[in-house]
Amino acid sequence: MQKDTIKIAIAGPRGRMGSEAVKLVEDTAHFELVGAIDRTYNREKLSDVMTSSSDAVIYTDITECFSETSPDVLIDLTTPEIGKLHTKIALEHGVRPVVGTTGFSESDLNELMELTDEKGIGAIIAPNFALGAVLMMKFSQMAANYFTDVEIIEQHHDQKLDAPSGTALKTAEMISAVREAKTQGHPDEKEILPGARGADQNGIRLHSVRLPGLIAHQEVMFGGDGQTLKIRHDSYNRASFMSGVKLAVEQVMKIDQLVYGLENIIE
């Protein structure tokens, strides 16, 4: 289903990502911001509590927001646990979720897949909304057909709660789909300090860096005989994610199943 104007509710509008999403919706002619979900400021106008031109009302109860504003889409940019809860509630109310939080397990995704099938509406969960990061993952999967030794180094700001990042895990998953699991490095290698070689997913080593001054960065490093290949993406501000959010909102109106990963809607 495609509508001329897409009515949107945003969860977490005052956060760093959420405030960018508010700007995106306000600046997009065929988007309409009809409500927001926040922990505080119940029933106040968004424009009264943050820099915004919107008169959309803030709700601390997500079900009240849905019943009173009837959004088509929920953009959720909160935390992993809240994001999981909001996604389920949205689907139960016939609202299509576009979710930028990570931490969804395979069982979580299976449950949500059943719910989208039952409701006949779409949902998009994306570990990363930056289109460049999505292309990095796709290019890395292509490269893994030719280079089987690979490690992933992801770097994020020091307020990020999960490690490794959802993008790193998704990248490793995509590489594993075309590469047999293998043990990398010397078979007798020993970690002098536990964890020095990073986390292990199907033989792929994942390394996480957390420092102030960073936003979101990832390098996928492949090694072969006499050569290396590095595929890197850097997000220098959170505006870099908004083109992917816009694409996801538009695409979620056209699908009737759960899509995990923005790479699955990029042709």
Swiss-Prot record:
<protein>
    <recommendedName>
        <fullName>4-hydroxy-tetrahydrodipicolinate reductase</fullName>
        <ecNumber>1.17.1.8</ecNumber>
    </recommendedName>
</protein>
<dbReference type="Pfam" id="PF01113">
    <property type="entry name" value="DapB_N"/>
</dbReference>
<dbReference type="InterPro" id="IPR022663">
    <property type="entry name" value="DapB_C"/>
</dbReference>
<dbReference type="GO" id="GO:0050661">
    <property type="term" value="F:NADP binding"/>
</dbReference>
<feature type="binding site">
    <location>
        <begin position="100"/>
        <end position="102"/>
    </location>
    <ligand>
        <name>NAD(+)</name>
    </ligand>
</feature>
<comment type="function">
    <text>Catalyzes the conversion of 4-hydroxy-tetrahydrodipicolinate (HTPA) to tetrahydrodipicolinate.</text>
</comment>
<keyword id="KW-0560">Oxidoreductase</keyword>
<keyword id="KW-0520">NAD</keyword>
<feature type="active site" description="Proton donor">
    <location>
        <position position="160"/>
    </location>
</feature>
<dbReference type="InterPro" id="IPR022664">
    <property type="entry name" value="DapB_N_CS"/>
</dbReference>
<dbReference type="GO" id="GO:0009089">
    <property type="term" value="P:lysine biosynthetic process via diaminopimelate"/>
</dbReference>
<dbReference type="GO" id="GO:0051287">
    <property type="term" value="F:NAD binding"/>
</dbReference>
<feature type="binding site">
    <location>
        <begin position="126"/>
        <end position="129"/>
    </location>
    <ligand>
        <name>NAD(+)</name>
    </ligand>
</feature>
<feature type="active site" description="Proton donor/acceptor">
    <location>
        <position position="156"/>
    </location>
</feature>
<comment type="similarity">
    <text>Belongs to the DapB family.</text>
</comment>
<comment type="pathway">
    <text>Amino-acid biosynthesis; L-lysine biosynthesis via DAP pathway; (S)-tetrahydrodipicolinate from L-aspartate: step 4/4.</text>
</comment>
<dbReference type="GO" id="GO:0005829">
    <property type="term" value="C:cytosol"/>
</dbReference>
<dbReference type="InterPro" id="IPR036291">
    <property type="entry name" value="NAD(P)-bd_dom_sf"/>
</dbReference>
<keyword id="KW-0220">Diaminopimelate biosynthesis</keyword>
<feature type="binding site">
    <location>
        <position position="157"/>
    </location>
    <ligand>
        <name>(S)-2,3,4,5-tetrahydrodipicolinate</name>
    </ligand>
</feature>
<dbReference type="GO" id="GO:0019877">
    <property type="term" value="P:diaminopimelate biosynthetic process"/>
</dbReference>
<dbReference type="Pfam" id="PF05173">
    <property type="entry name" value="DapB_C"/>
</dbReference>
<keyword id="KW-0457">Lysine biosynthesis</keyword>
<feature type="binding site">
    <location>
        <begin position="166"/>
        <end position="167"/>
    </location>
    <ligand>
        <name>(S)-2,3,4,5-tetrahydrodipicolinate</name>
    </ligand>
</feature>
<dbReference type="InterPro" id="IPR000846">
    <property type="entry name" value="DapB_N"/>
</dbReference>
<keyword id="KW-0028">Amino-acid biosynthesis</keyword>
<feature type="binding site">
    <location>
        <begin position="12"/>
        <end position="17"/>
    </location>
    <ligand>
        <name>NAD(+)</name>
    </ligand>
</feature>
<keyword id="KW-0521">NADP</keyword>
<dbReference type="InterPro" id="IPR023940">
    <property type="entry name" value="DHDPR_bac"/>
</dbReference>
<dbReference type="GO" id="GO:0016726">
    <property type="term" value="F:oxidoreductase activity, acting on CH or CH2 groups, NAD or NADP as acceptor"/>
</dbReference>
<dbReference type="GO" id="GO:0008839">
    <property type="term" value="F:4-hydroxy-tetrahydrodipicolinate reductase"/>
</dbReference>
<keyword id="KW-0963">Cytoplasm</keyword>
